[in-house]
């Protein structure tokens, strides 16, 4: 099956009331794990790559691994999404490389550290939409800065994260402003700020409404009911994998992620794309540590990497099933980007 646009997939998810986990990838084992879980559950896939992932794997290597996934799993619709684009030029380069969806993160300046002003965000995002939509590529924007309502810190992942201490207002998307932003930019999907952050250290305790503003999703959705909402920093940080990492020599302090049941609340309120990276990293790290410890004489890295792939696959399968993705892939008929482009004209 050819790669499809994010807009087509999220429109389908909106019509049938499910959410799609968007998994960050940077290596072969991660892509294998995601595609095998998708095949097993008949789930559509969003594979997304950050600037750090593209630097690590190499743009061409990453692109061809995704094309190989599409060839190997012809019945599974795949979106290739650029995560956290820092400028229109970066988004343009990704489109030329074959990405079918790009995120223009105008909530931060091009250094991906400095919070931007609203007009800057609108202008750079509008320019990317104009460029991408002309050829059927989807665009995700971001309004508000990801960050912890507990600490005021954004956290950092692959070089992305606001520096300094952020105010509560900066870390919560304003619903009325979201309506204006969508009207002025034309984004297909909007990443919103509700107190989530990148990385494993999201919350020091199980999150409640004072540090995870789930009700804000409903308020935003009421203002922009036709725009797909995106939750970033939404790994659940499985405690069982933290225990395995600690048991086999790792040192990860007490931490909590976004509970799956809270994500399901978000899906009911209009969230269609749920970004997940840390959960896969934790599962792979735990599996590798256990594999190497269980057989200290083993020197074939494939054994540990196979264990890592199995660990990641188990997490991915659970998310497909929980979010309602399972069984949806076979219901999607791919629309060529050329036809998608006509929808914007």
UniProtKB/Swiss-Prot annotation:
Binding site for D-glyceraldehyde 3-phosphate: 50
EC number from the UniProt entry: 4.1.2.13
Residues reported in the UniProt entry to bind Zn(2+) 2: 105, 142
Catalytic activity: beta-D-fructose 1,6-bisphosphate = D-glyceraldehyde 3-phosphate + dihydroxyacetone phosphate
Pathway entry: Carbohydrate biosynthesis; Calvin cycle; Carbohydrate degradation; glycolysis; D-glyceraldehyde 3-phosphate and glycerone phosphate from D-glucose: step 4/4
Record's signal peptide: none
InterPro entries per the UniProt record, alphabetical: Aldolase_TIM, Class_II_FBP_aldolase, FBA_II, Fruct_bisP_Calv
Gene3D superfamilies cross-referenced by the UniProt entry: Aldolase class I
Ligand binding (dihydroxyacetone phosphate): 199, 233-235, 275-278
One GO BP: glycolytic process
UniProt remark on cofactor binding: Binds 2 Zn(2+) ions per subunit. One is catalytic and the other provides a structural contribution.
Any one GO molecular function term: zinc ion binding
Source taxon at top rank: Bacteria
PANTHER family to which the protein is assigned, alphabetical: D-TAGATOSE-1,6-BISPHOSPHATE ALDOLASE, D-TAGATOSE-1,6-BISPHOSPHATE ALDOLASE SUBUNIT GATY-RELATED
Annotated function: Catalyzes the aldol condensation of dihydroxyacetone phosphate (DHAP or glycerone-phosphate) with glyceraldehyde 3-phosphate (G3P) to form fructose 1,6-bisphosphate (FBP) in gluconeogenesis and the reverse reaction in glycolysis.
Record text on subunit structure and interactions: Homodimer.
Similarity annotation: Belongs to the class II fructose-bisphosphate aldolase family.
Protein name stated in the entry: Fructose-bisphosphate aldolase, chromosomal
Lineage: Bacteria, Pseudomonadati, Pseudomonadota, Betaproteobacteria, Burkholderiales
């Amino acid at each position: 099956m050819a790669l499809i646009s994010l807009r087509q997939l999220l429109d389908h998810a909106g019509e049938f009331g499910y959410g799609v986990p968007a998994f960050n990838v940077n290596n072969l084992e991660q892509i294998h794990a995601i595609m095998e879980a998708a095949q097993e559950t008949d789930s559509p896939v969003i594979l997304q790559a950050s600037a750090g992932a593209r630097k690590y794997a190499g743009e061409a290597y990453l692109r061809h691994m995704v094309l190989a996934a599409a060839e190997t799993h012809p019945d599974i619709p795949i979106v290739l999404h650029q995560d956290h684009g820092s400028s229109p030029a970066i988004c343009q380069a990704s489109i030329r490389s074959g990405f079918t969806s790009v995120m223009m993160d105008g909530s931060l300046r091009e250094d991906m550290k400095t919070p931007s002003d609203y007009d800057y965000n609108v202008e750079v995002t509008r320019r990317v939409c104009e460029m991408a939509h002309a050829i059927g590529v989807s665009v995700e924007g971001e309004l508000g800065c990801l960050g912890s309502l507990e600490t005021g810190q954004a956290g950092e992942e692959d070089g992305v994260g606001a520096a300094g201490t952020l105010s509560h207002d900066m870390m919560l998307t304003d619903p009325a402003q979201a309506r204006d932003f969508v009207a002025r930019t034309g984004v297909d999907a909007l990443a919103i700020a509700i107190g989530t952050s990148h990385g494993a250290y999201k919350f020091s305790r199980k999150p409640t409404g004072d540090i995870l503003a789930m009700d804000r999703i409903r308020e935003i959705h009421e203002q922009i009911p036709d725009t797909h909402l995106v939750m970033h920093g939404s790994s659940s940080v499985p405690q069982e994998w933290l225990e395995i990492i600690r048991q086999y020599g790792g040192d990860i302090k007490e931490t909590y992620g976004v509970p799956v049941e809270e994500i399901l609340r978000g899906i009911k309120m209009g969230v269609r794309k749920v970004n997940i990276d840390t959960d896969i990293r934790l599962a792979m790290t735990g599996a590798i540590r256990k594999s190497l410890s269980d057989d200290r004489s083993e020197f074939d890295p494939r054994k540990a990497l196979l264990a890592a792939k199995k660990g990641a696959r188990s997490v991915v399968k659970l998310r497909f099933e929980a979010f309602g993705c399972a069984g949806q892939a076979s219901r999607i008929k791919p629309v060529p980007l050329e036809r998608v482009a006509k929808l914007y004209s």
